[in-house]
C-alpha cells in the first residue's frame, strides 16, 4: 500500500473535518480519545487573519499536522505536534480499519525527523503503541490515571476555611483571576500551567460549558483563592480542574472545593464522575481514593 505523508501548519476546513471524523471513529473503536481535548479544540480554531494567506484551521500556538493517506487519497492516520511545548509533544491516531500496516511507523518516523527530542502520548493502552515506542527507543516518563467514582448522596457538606465564600464563575469577568491562580497552582504542570484567557474562552464556547458548575472560592475582597471547574459530557461528570492558590493551600480549601463540585454533579442526577491525576502525585491520589475514586485507565507519555 502506498502511504503519502504530508506535513503542514494549517488545515483546510474540509481536511480538518475529515481528521475530526477519523478521531471520532478511533475514539469509538478504542473507548478513549486518541488525542487530548486541547488538540481537538485547536483543530476547530483559526489563527489570526492578518498572518494567513488563506483561511486555514488548526494554525494556532505552534500546532503542526501530519497526515497519511493511501494512493487514492483515503485518510489513514493523523498526528498532531505541539511545537510550542519544550520538548515538543505529539499525539497520533491510526484509523481502526488500517492498523498493523505501517501507518503508525510512518507517522512516528516523520515526527522524530521533525523533532529529535520528543514526547508522545498514548491514550488507549493499545499494546501496539508500546511496541512502536520500544522500536523507536522511547521510554515511559509519565503516567496519567483516569479515576472514577460513583456519585452518591453522602458526600459531606464542604467545610470552608475562615473568611472564604463560594460563588460561581461570571463569564467576561473572572477569566483573568482564574488564569492567574491556575498558573500559580500548576506552575509544576507541563500542560495545565500554560492555560491562558484565550484557552478559558475557547472552553466557554463549548456546548458542555456551564458557569453554574464552575465554583470560585473568594475572600472578603472577592479575591480568588481557588476554584473547581466541573464538566458534564454524555452523562458523565468530571472534576475538570481544581486549582488552589499556593498561599491558600493547607487549610482544607482543595477538599472543600472538590466536595462542592461533587455535590453539584450529584444534584444533576449523574451516576458517575471521573478525573485525571498524575500517578506519582501520591497525595492527590490518596485524597481521591478516600472519596471513593478508583483507577479506571491510564494515559502514558513516552519520551525520546
Please report, for each region that a protein language model flagged, where it lies by residue.
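Short amphipathic alpha-helix that is part of the acyltransferase structural core
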Residues: 1-53, 159-193
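Conserved donor-binding loop and adjoining core beta-sheet/short helix segment
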Residues: 8-13, 23-115, 119, 225-237
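Glycine-rich acetyl-CoA-binding "A-motif" of GNAT/NAT acetyltransferases
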Residues: 72-77, 141, 211, 222-226, ...
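Acyl-donor-binding surface of acyltransferase catalytic domains
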Residues: 83-91, 95-164, 300-304
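Active-site acidic-Proline motif in GNAT/NAT acetyltransferases
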Residues: 95-97, 232, 245-247, 251, ...
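Conserved acetyl-CoA-binding loop-helix of GNAT-fold acetyltransferases
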Residues: 100-114, 135, 244-246, 250-267, ...
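Active-site/acyl-donor-binding loops of N-acyltransferases
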Residues: 135-155, 259-263, 268-304
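Phosphate-binding active sites in nucleotide-utilizing proteins
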Residues: 188-236, 246
